[in-house]
């Protein structure tokens, strides 16, 4: 494996990140994909570039994106009693052939550092039991389960981490 390049995505280089995020969404959630582009990806600059409570990180092997992670302002759509300046961790994905090499942990560490430097104190995420090892991974990153519930078609695990 070559040297990997981790970087925060900016205004000039976000289109490949959006394409990768759409590709991974289709892989993970084919039953809800239906070609619909989520609001944060339609308005990438607004959510991840211009908003001080937004960040999108890619990791590349040569010029190919092989993984991503991001956070954006949390919209409080779940009744979880989280602080008002909470951000939601989203879009963690590493291509299967690059997994089990510490890349996801490295992406998380970079994201946590960026969040601390932006004076963010609470991170929120949700995951699902059908994603192999997701809950265990996030627990190893310092997240704690705050609630489990059934939403629409998925069991959902809500987790948070204080920085």
Question: Where do the language-model regions lie?
Answer:
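Extreme N-terminal starter segment of soluble prokaryotic enzymes
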Residues: 2-6
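Acetyl-CoA-dependent GNAT
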Residues: 8-90, 95, 108-110, 114, ...
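C-terminal "cap" of GNAT-fold acetyltransferases
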Residues: 23-24, 121-163
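Ser/Thr-centric signal marking residues that sit
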Residues: 68, 105, 127
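Charged, amphipathic alpha-helical coiled-coil/dimerization segments
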Residues: 85, 100-101, 106, 123
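Active-site acidic-Proline motif in GNAT/NAT acetyltransferases
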Residues: 95-97, 101, 129
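Conserved GNAT acetyl-CoA-binding A-motif
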Residues: 108, 115-126
């Amino acid at each position: 494996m070559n040297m990997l390049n981790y970087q925060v995505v900016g205004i000039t280089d976000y289109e490949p990140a959006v394409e990768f995020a759409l590709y991974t969404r289709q892989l993970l959630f084919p039953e809800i994909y239906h070609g619909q582009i989520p609001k944060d990806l339609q308005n990438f600059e607004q959510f991840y570039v211009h908003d001080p409570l937004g960040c999108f990180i890619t990791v590349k092997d040569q010029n190919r994106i092989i993984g991503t992670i991001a956070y954006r302002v949390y919209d409080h759509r779940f009744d979880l009693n989280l602080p008002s300046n909470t951000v939601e961790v989203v879009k963690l994905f590493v291509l299967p052939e690059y997994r089990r090499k510490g890349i996801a942990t490295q992406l998380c560490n970079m994201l946590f550092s960026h969040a601390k430097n932006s004076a963010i104190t609470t991170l929120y995420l949700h995951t699902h039991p059908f994603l192999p090892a997701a809950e265990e991974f996030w627990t190893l990153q310092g997240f704690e389960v705050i609630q489990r519930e059934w939403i629409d078609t998925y069991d959902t695990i809500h987790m948070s981490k204080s920085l």
